[in-house]
Amino acid sequence: MKKRIKELTDLLNRYRYDYYTKDAPSVSDSDYDKLYRELVTLEQSYPEYVLQDSPTQQVGGTILKGFEKYRHQYPLFSLQDAFSREELDAFDKRVKAEFPNATYLAELKIDGLSISLSYENGFLQVGATRGDGNIGENITENIKKIKDIPHQLSEPLTITVRGEAYMSRQSFKAINEARQENGETEFANPRNAAAGTLRQLDTSVVAKRQLATFLYQEASPTARNQQNEVLAELAGLGFSVNPYYQLTSSMDEIWDFIKTIEAKRDQLAYDIDGVVIKVNSLAMQEELGFTVKAPRWAIAYKFPAEEKEAEILSVDWTVGRTGVVTPTANLTPVQLAGTTVSRATLHNVDYIAEKDIRIGDTVIVYKAGDIIPAVLNVVMSKRNQQEVMLIPKLCPSCGSELVHFEDEVALRCINPLCPSLIQRSLEHFASRDAMNITGLGPAIVEKLFLAGFVHDVADIYQLTKENFMQLDGIKEKSADKLLAAIEASKSNSAEKLLFGLGIRHIGSKVSRLILEVYGDISALLTAKEEEIARIDGLGSTIAQSLTQYFEQKTAAILVDELKTAGVNMHYSGQKVNSDAALFGLTVVLTGKLNQLNRNEAKDKLEALGAKVTGSVSKKTDLVIAGSDAGSKLEKAKSLGIRIEDEDWLRQL
């Protein structure tokens, strides 16, 4: 082992010299990483043989075993997208209906990776990725290699901030030139390069690639009152803040700002993909609140996507887990937004009819949201044949007759025994955001289904090693890993299970909101529609969908089978008490409190199930008024809102 450690040390040091001194990498990142991992493992087992010049002992580079999960104290939400002036005007109308005097701050939407930075007494403690908004990955060591992120703030604050890590166009060009010379695959775009860099296990590679950041939000409570004040404070603390933003109450001025930025987009040193418009007042932001997925006080205008022409060669029709049959066009390959595109969604049959899309047509292809390739329209001037699109009447999977409901745009297979529907449901159940059964992907699900081993999600927990070993291509080691992943999934918190059941309108975030109140899957079997609709962030559509699902006898049977198999039914997060005195009420504190300070009062209200906001509106249910209460109290009286005092609150 001593000899192997010496060999690895010498070899890796030579590679490091080629990479950092000569700027001419002589080995791929993946090969370097494998050798580095081997050295770390050997050094941990035989510490007496660690050499002084080992790359693991060098300042400026640390090899990481992997990235630990990190639960965000303050969740990261996605933003609602807008693609037109009309959508921005609709957003403005919604906001101004609540706050006629609202102003907006328009900021650039950096095309990078969302990061969260937590400081304690001014010192950086954790840097994390966004992940699913609730759980990301701890990448602190890599974050520390980004030069413009301060390790110590100019003030000893305990604070969590948010921003975007990105790679400049200059750095991206240099990296791809080096990768090309070394025979490595080039990165498709700066965003992909930044993502790959932040997940490097060798931190010295992160330092070499020169990522940068722009910070834009204080996620933890702040003394600032306006978003533009937050940006100023972040800059004062030592963070990089993007210099391009505009404060205005006029959507016309915001549109002018968008067009100005769009015109100079190519002159910037970094990629942007739009402009984010935020309500500037933090109190108004708090009052407007959130939907399940996004804040109501912000919207992201996305620049028009790059468009290319391609020919439709054929169309595939596939059945999803809810029975919806989706058409996908097979295209002549085109380069689009840094990737080769040969397939694009046609959305649904109504879309095909509306656009008169036919096989053989030349069409305009773009990436919806810069992610999903889609067909925009037909280039009619290039139509040279009249082959009409054949809309299927029978399910491509089971042969059952497809239905087209009046209130829907898609074809649907309503056969509960449809093989594709069952397989998609099983795939969804095993997916990362659901039960996260590692290795149980589409290919293995299909083999299990065709072999007759699984027909619903409960069957997954009855699988044996022998079942897996009978599948083509599955060896003993793989079977053991799959069984271990299935066993591990039993202990997931119940919101994962609820999402995995694939109920219409019940996404991962909605699942968490529901179980924060009900606490257990079994409780949903008797939950009332009106009770569910009261949960903040939900509504009648979600409540109806959930109750309709659990009213079915098959749902009760499935829950019982899963419970018998040992699958956890309990929510492991902090539960909201739906029996609390103020559950579901929106409450505003105003005036001076004599016995409780403001934070104590807020904590008590939240413990009683209330949502505490900063300003009074028609959505407010209750105002707690202390002495010297001013305009908020007067507004509450004018709106006929219930008003109580501090003594009333203390007695609850």
UniProtKB/Swiss-Prot annotation:
One of its GO terms (molecular function) is DNA binding. GO terms for biological process: DNA repair; DNA replication. It comes from the Bacteria. NAD(+) binds at D29, S30, D31, Y32, D33, S78, L79, E107, R130, E164, K278, K302. The keyword Transferase does not apply. Keywords: DNA damage, DNA repair, DNA replication, Ligase, Magnesium, Manganese, Metal-binding, NAD, Zinc. Zn(2+) binds at C395, C398, C413, C418. It catalyses: NAD(+) + (deoxyribonucleotide)n-3'-hydroxyl + 5'-phospho-(deoxyribonucleotide)m = (deoxyribonucleotide)n+m + AMP + beta-nicotinamide D-nucleotide. Pfam families: BRCT (PF00533), DNA_ligase_aden (PF01653), DNA_ligase_OB (PF03120), DNA_ligase_ZBD (PF03119), HHH_2 (PF12826), HHH_5 (PF14520). Belongs to the NAD-dependent DNA ligase family. LigA subfamily. NCBIfam families: dnlj (TIGR00575), PRK07956.1 (NF005932). This is DNA ligase. It comes from Streptococcus pyogenes serotype M12 (strain MGAS2096).
